């Protein structure tokens, strides 16, 4: 208890005369001091309790915000991982046979070279050779058809503008009738798988024509 409260409850006030102005003033002053002292104590208690409530709440709010940020970052990372995984799986499906297909194209080239090596007219004079050549042609077509079923497509660059992404120029052909760099001859067929070049077409391009005419590239 404060001194003011003790004074207010002191027995000396029990015998005060309320009719006496000095006693009334003394009693009033003691009561004012008592009320002020208790009001100050109550205010201090309220402030102390408020601080105890505000600090933990602010800490919880900060912790909640930090956890929410971590959760959002984790969700973004998981979404990026999901997309990357889906893309890798799609690429694996589309391009898993790329090396095998490239090797099979070399076999196809050899079959075509074997057919080209047969002298013109020899098949008409030799039934056995004709049958063999037809068998080789059928085998080569079946091989290419099988590759096409797995996404391998032949490039048809004849008459199109040279595109270094799909074509490999080996020589130039003088020709003023078509724009410069127009593909004039295909030495070796090119192929794509999906959106990737499996093998560029080896071509000869025109030289001596107009230089400012754009010819649309077609790698179908």
Swiss-Prot record:
Subunit details: Homodimer.
GO process terms (BP): protein folding
Function: Participates actively in the response to hyperosmotic and heat shock by preventing the aggregation of stress-denatured proteins, in association with DnaK and GrpE. It is the nucleotide exchange factor for DnaK and may function as a thermosensor. Unfolded proteins bind initially to DnaJ; upon interaction with the DnaJ-bound protein, DnaK hydrolyzes its bound ATP, resulting in the formation of a stable complex. GrpE releases ADP from DnaK; ATP binding to DnaK triggers the release of the substrate protein, thus completing the reaction cycle.
Subcellular compartments: Cytoplasm
KW ATP-binding (keyword) present: no
Name the record gives this protein: Protein GrpE
Entries under NCBIfam families matching the protein: PRK14140.1, PRK14141.1, PRK14150.1
Pfam families: GrpE
Entry's Gene Ontology molecular function annotations: adenyl-nucleotide exchange factor activity; protein homodimerization activity; protein-folding chaperone binding; unfolded protein binding
């Amino acid at each position: 208890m404060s001194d003011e409260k003790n004074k207010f409850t002191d027995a000396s006030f029990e015998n005060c005369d309320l009719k006496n102005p000095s006693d009334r003033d003394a009693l009033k002053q003691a009561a004012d001091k008592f009320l002020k002292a208790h009001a100050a104590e109550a205010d201090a208690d309220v402030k102390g309790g408020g601080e105890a409530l505000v600090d933990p709440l602010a800490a919880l709010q900060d912790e909640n915000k930090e956890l929410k940020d971590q959760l959002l970052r984790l969700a973004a990372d998981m979404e990026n991982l999901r997309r990357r995984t889906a893309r890798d799986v799609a690429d694996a499906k589309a391009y898993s046979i790329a090396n095998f297909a490239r090797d099979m194209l070399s076999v196809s080239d050899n079959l075509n070279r074997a057919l080209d090596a047969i002298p013109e007219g020899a098949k008409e004079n030799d039934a056995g050779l004709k049958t063999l050549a037809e068998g080789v042609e059928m085998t080569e077509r079946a091989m290419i058809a099988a590759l096409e079923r797995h996404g391998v497509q032949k490039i048809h660059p004849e008459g199109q503008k040279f595109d270094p992404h799909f074509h490999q120029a080996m020589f130039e052909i003088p020709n003023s009738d078509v724009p410069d760099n127009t593909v004039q001859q295909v030495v070796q067929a090119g192929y794509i798988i999906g959106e990737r070049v499996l093998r560029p077409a080896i071509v000869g391009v025109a030289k001596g024509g107009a230089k400012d005419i754009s010819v649309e590239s077609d790698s179908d």
